[in-house]
């Protein structure tokens, strides 16, 4: 499964194999299952440099994007870490994306993080070692150099952040033109 998840740049295999999400119908967390249009969105992310999702509210795209970012961070190397910038019209909304991503990162099986973070010995310190170098409301930084940053929209939203590899503009309809 790992090799298939790694090879699948849409991250569908990774998401459906290793992640779970809240199912409102069942009222509990269940294994992530992508609907056909969600699969099409993930395939578009894999095949295109820039993707804009124009969709109604409550379609699960923010959660799906968070799951995809998780896959990108899991498979990133220290030589080419991901820098993800999440911008929303309010800081709290951008921080909600970080909460989703953190939840997904914590679901990733420990062995996927490598020998420094996993041991078959259940009493090993490796199994509880944090994958986060920074774990704050506004930013996550993983041991492999990946960063996820939350910012409110505004003229300085991306100031001080270089080499953004993934930009998420959440609820873009509420972001004023020219301030993201």
Where are these regions (language model features)?
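Phosphate/NTP-binding elements of NTP-utilizing enzymes
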Residues: 1-180
